[in-house]
A protein has these predicted regions:
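Extracytoplasmic electron-transfer domains, predominantly the class I c-type cytochrome c fold
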Residues: 7-20, 64, 68, 74-126
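Electrostatic cytochrome c docking/interface patches
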Residues: 10-52, 149
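A short beta-strand motif characteristic of beta-propeller blades
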Residues: 180-185, 221-229, 269-274, 278-285, ...
Length: 554
């Protein structure tokens, strides 16, 4: 059995790094249950194992251990296997995809024994999160009546960048014109995304701990004016964009509990909570914890487009009457994650990452327009739109699990034969890509690979000429240009254009105790334009240009 397990090649280092991110549930108090059939564990051991589980395992096996992208690990399955059997598979992994935790050096023998016993006990359940719980966290620090009635600063708001400072629980607002930091704002832990109000005045950020901050960019020094926590773990926030509803509502989706919350657009006062627990598309099996992934505000209707990860459903949530909420359910494929609009802003292209598919949601007609196979574990961010010389308008995504970029046709009128199909693959340097990006005024397509284990790949960026894709990519040594003097990881992450579309910004991301930077490149010449260094730029990761985020330009 051990020899067989050692042959496993199911999980790459890239995939393990992506799936095994620390969960905020690590520090959430939970009760140890007793299972008389399970091997004994002290309370201290149980707490240690629970912490490791939420740091390393919950991303694949689920909060309740009932399975997500990985297999279920519930006592009805694990007790019968026995401790010795489980230790082998934790230590050596399996061809089906279990990482080899001990032989990779991630766990020692004692930790493997601890985890083998832990998964034979009943899974501790984190608490639910009600409207009352949400209201207890809701704070309005500057009431709407006390906010400016006009812009009180000289910043070019449309060219401000919101940059996540991942490990400090902050964002940096950076002036895209001067390249100077405007302010550092305290937020939730590890801000996942920044999103704009339809008017462009308010910036909304959400941490992995489900805390939302509402930031007023009209203030003399932009700062948070309201905050709320919508659960225990989350990834997504969005605002209403439809005519007559601009700036009226905000929505956020939680990983735990599996639900979304609709709030007032001026104050973040919670108004409505909707659970996403339900049946998986295709198998029609009940799933107890389907996480809310990406959310988009429709430009066509008063609807939020909510992607539910494990069930593979896209929910078209009509917010015109919260007291009589209407939801249209569109099934595509399990493990829906991130995505963005095509160039026409009609079709929401969303990755079903562990299904290796891209779904195209027609936001105007409210239906599934297409579902196409792509590479291994697509991760587009919001993707990248450009016009291909042969296939017309395409939307593109990179992949975590292979070295390709998939191009998908998005014009069913003029290029019907290519619509919502993978029309081409570009070869990249290696897996581990998180974001691709282009711009309507650019001839370039950019891709990162920060999770690639090879520093030569993770510390660089690749760029393609969209008019000469057959020539392959050029590699730019972004981390080298940053000229950081220590031995940090220097992972280059998330290309982001300025408003004009003539600069591309990159984070050079190292650990909290190492130096990081932001590198700005001239999009036309591909030459270094500016390196932004500041002691306050600690673990910069994602960044979002106000105008491009507000208008879905990517």
């Amino acid at each position: 059995l051990g020899a067989f397990a050692q042959e496993q090649k199911g999980v790459s280092e890239v995939e393990r790094n992506y799936q095994a991110g620390t969960s905020p549930l690590t520090t959430t108090p939970m009760v140890q249950s007793t299972n008389p059939k399970a091997p004994p564990m002290s309370l201290v051991e149980f707490e240690a194992a629970r912490k490791i589980y939420f740091e390393r395992c919950a991303g694949c096996h689920g909060v309740l251990r009932k399975g997500a992208t990985g297999k279920p690990l519930t006592p009805d399955l694990t007790v019968a296997k026995g401790t010795d059997y489980l230790k082998v598979f934790i230590a050596y992994g399996s061809p089906a995809g279990m990482p080899n935790w001990q032989t990779s050096g991630e766990m020692d023998e004692a930790t493997v024994d601890l985890m083998a016993r832990y998964i034979q006990h009943d899974a501790p359940t984190p608490p639910e999160w009600s409207l009352d719980d949400t209201k207890k966290t809701w704070k309005v620090t500057v009431a709407p009546k006390d906010r400016p009635t006009k812009k009180m600063n000289n910043f070019n708001i449309e060219n401000i960048f919101s940059t996540t400072l991942r490990d400090t629980g902050e964002i940096a607002l950076i002036d895209g014109d001067t390249k100077e930091i405007i302010s550092i704002i305290k937020t939730g832990y590890a801000v996942h995304i920044s999103r704009m109000s339809a008017s462009g005045r308010y910036l909304f950020v959400i941490g992995r701990d489900a805390k939302i901050n509402m930031i007023d960019l009209w203030m003399a020094k932009p700062d948070s004016v309201a905050e709320v926590r919508i659960g225990l773990e989350a990834r997504s926030v969005e605002t209403s964009k439809a005519k007559g509803y601009k700036d009226k509502l905000v929505i956020a989706g939680a990983y735990w509990p599996p639900q979304f919350t609709i709030m007032d657009g001026d104050t973040l006062e919670p108004k409505k909570i909707v659970s996403t627990r339900g049946m998986v598309v295709g198998t029609q099996e009940y799933h107890p914890e389907p996480r809310v992934a990406s959310i988009l505000g429709s430009h066509y209707k008063p609807e939020f487009i909510v992607n539910v990860k494990e069930t593979g459903k896209t929910l078209m949530v009509d917010y015109s009457n919260l007291d009589a909420l209407k939801i249209t359910e569109i099934g595509s494929a399990p493990f829906l994650h991130d995505g963005g609009l095509d160039a026409s802003k009609r079709y929401f292209m969303v990755a079903a990452n562990n299904s290796n598919k891209i779904a195209a949601i027609d936001t105007k007609d409210g239906k599934l327009a297409g579902l196409t196979d792509v590479g291994k574990i697509p991760h587009p961010g919001r993707g990248a739109n450009f016009t291909h010389p042969q296939f017309g308008p395409v939307w593109s995504t990179g992949h975590l699990g292979d070295d390709t970029i998939s191009l998908i046709g998005t014009d069913p009128k003029k290029f019907k034969q290519y619509a919502f199909k993978e029309v081409a693959k570009l070869k990249g340097p290696g897996g581990g890509a998180l974001f691709v990006k282009s711009h309507p005024k650019s001839k370039n397509l950019w891709s990162d690979a920060p999770l690639n284990p090879d520093p030569k790949i993770s510390q660089a960026i690749v760029v393609y000429d969209i008019n000469n894709l057959d020539k392959g990519y050029k590699t730019l040594p972004i981390a080298e240009w940053a000229d950081l003097k220590d031995d940090g990881a220097k992972r280059v992450v998330q290309p982001e254009y300025n408003k004009a579309g003539d600069e591309v910004w990159f984070s050079v991301w190292s650990a909290k105790n190492k130096e990081s930077a932001i590198v700005v490149v001239d999009d036309k010449t591909l030459k270094l334009k500016k390196v932004i260094k500041d002691p306050r730029l600690i673990t910069p990761t994602g960044h979002f240009n106000v105008y491009n985020t507000q208008h879905d330009v990517y």
